Curated annotation (Swiss-Prot):
UniProt name for this protein: Nucleoporin nup45
GO annotation, cellular component aspect: cytoplasm; nuclear periphery; nuclear pore; nucleus
Major localization class: cytoplasm
Keywords: Cytoplasm, mRNA transport, Nuclear pore complex, Nucleus, Phosphoprotein, Protein transport, Translocation, Transport
Record-level GO BP terms: mRNA transport; nucleocytoplasmic transport; protein transport
Biological role stated in the UniProt entry: Functions as a component of the nuclear pore complex (NPC). NPC components, collectively referred to as nucleoporins (NUPs), can play the role of both NPC structural components and of docking or interaction partners for transiently associated nuclear transport factors. Active directional transport is assured by both, a Phe-Gly (FG) repeat affinity gradient for these transport factors across the NPC and a transport cofactor concentration gradient across the nuclear envelope.
Length: 425
């Protein structure tokens, strides 16, 4: 089995070269341990199909690939027919680092799909040991690499990745295309494998690199959630932030309670102050009326005093002029009805008479009132008499004030008339 000569199991011919005298038996992988070809010209087939054709029509060439994919000196081989009678072609072998050999083969499907060859075409690259794309080597006669088909004839366009997870899209068992998010490779490289379930359903998974290299994907940090708080939760079982929040809330509630109690205490005083506002307003209005009346009386008094002063000034000026006339030697004072000095005495006499008449009328009114008071028994009290006298005094003061105003107006008119005379001006 491992290179020893034996009778073939499936009808393969095991012949030896009579010229060389040595027989090169093929091992399990149709080569020696490291892929070096033997010097036998006539190969002996293994149990899985020799040169006459295996169970699935694969051809076992005598020469095997070397360690680095170099083309060995192979003898001619006779291809056999496969299970369905198709003439297969030699399959390209990959070297250790993915270099492609010169004879590509497009394997056939299970149900013997036609495998055509065209001249010329490029050979399909195969994956190396580390997933590197094998370099295509040109040859004189090439055939196109046929796409491998799945079990039911579906197109299988996926390629496998290398050791360090280069891109390799895969398909499902039934040939359906499926996608899978990028997974991390051995050293954290981003890969694009697409995996699926047994029936072609999309299986989106994401793995972590073996050495935890950085990946270009968003990371979500889940914050620790606070424990659930219910009626049976104790204060000591809460965290520090929740305890601080509860303490601040308790202080705020206590301060609001104190403020409410203080307002409740001051509520009676505030109510009294509010109720006293209308009374205070009425008192202020009454005092305002009194002040207004006093201001009016004072204004009248000032006007009266001003008129008296003006009148006295006019009289003093007239008197000084008359004295100047008498001081002049040989001068005589004219006696006429329009003499200012005569007018002065006439006005003074008239004013005195008016005042005497006013006083007499006032006294007469008082006598009449007093007689009425005396004849009324219920009004004989001293308080009623005193009140009556005070009211009469106010009346007299108002009348005298008014009389003084009229008198001042008359005097002003007289002074203006007297100043218009030639000898006074």
């Amino acid at each position: 089995m491992f290179g020893l000569n034996k009778t073939p199991s499936f009808g393969s011919t095991g012949t030896q070269n009579q010229n060389t005298g040595t027989s090169a038996g093929t091992g399990l992988f149709s080569s020696n341990t490291f892929g070096n070809n033997t010097q036998a010209n006539t190969p002996a087939s293994t149990g899985f199909g020799g040169v006459t054709g295996g169970a699935f029509g694969q051809t076992k060439p005598q020469t095997g690939g070397s360690l680095f994919g170099n083309k060995p000196n192979a003898t001619s081989t006779t291809p056999g027919l496969n299970l369905f009678g198709q003439n297969p072609q030699a399959a390209p072998g990959g070297s250790l680092f993915g270099a492609s050999t010169t004879k590509p083969q497009a394997p056939g499907g299970l149900f013997n799909q036609n495998q055509t060859q065209a001249q010329p075409a490029q050979a399909a690259p195969t994956g190396g040991l580390f997933g590197l794309s094998g370099q295509n080597q040109t040859q004189s006669q090439t055939q196109p690499a046929q796409a491998n088909t799945s079990l039911f004839g579906q197109s299988n366009i996926g390629t496998t990745g290398g050791l360090f997870d280069q891109n390799r899209p895969n398909t499902s068992t039934f040939g359906q295309f499926s996608t899978q998010p990028a997974s991390a490779g051995l050293f954290g490289q981003s890969t694009q494998p697409s995996g699926s379930t047994g029936f072609g359903l999309s299986n989106n998974t994401q793995t972590t690199p073996f050495f935890s290299a950085a990946q270009q994907q968003p990371s979500t940090t889940q914050l620790p959630s606070n424990p659930a708080i219910n009626a049976t939760t104790r204060y000591s079982s809460l965290n520090a932030n929740t305890q601080k929040f509860l303490d601040d809330l308790d202080k705020e509630i206590f301060s609001q309670i104190q403020l409410a109690e203080e307002l409740q205490t001051k509520l009676g005083t505030v109510s009294e102050l509010v109720e006293s506002v209308p009374n205070d307003v009425a008192e202020v209005q009454r005092r305002l009326s009194s002040v207004s009346t006093a201001l009016l009386i004072d204004s009248d008094e000032i006007e009266t005093t001003k008129r008296v002063v003006d009148e006295d000034t006019s009289n003093a000026r007239i008197s000084s002029r008359i004295l100047d006339v008498f001081k002049t030697p040989g001068a005589t004072y004219p006696f006429a009805s329009n003499d200012p000095l005569m007018n002065y005495f006439e006005q003074f006499t008239e004013n005195a008479k008016k005042r005497t008449d006013l006083y007499a009328a006032t006294i007469g009114e008082l006598e009449q009132h007093l007689e009425q008071v005396e004849t009324t028994p219920q009004n004989n009290s001293p308080e009623a008499l005193l009140k009556t006298i005070k009211e009469e005094h106010k009346l007299f003061m108002a009348l005298s004030n008014r009389f003084a105003q009229v008198h001042d107006e008359v005097k002003r008119l007289q002074v203006n008339t007297s100043t218009s005379l030639p000898f006074i001006s």
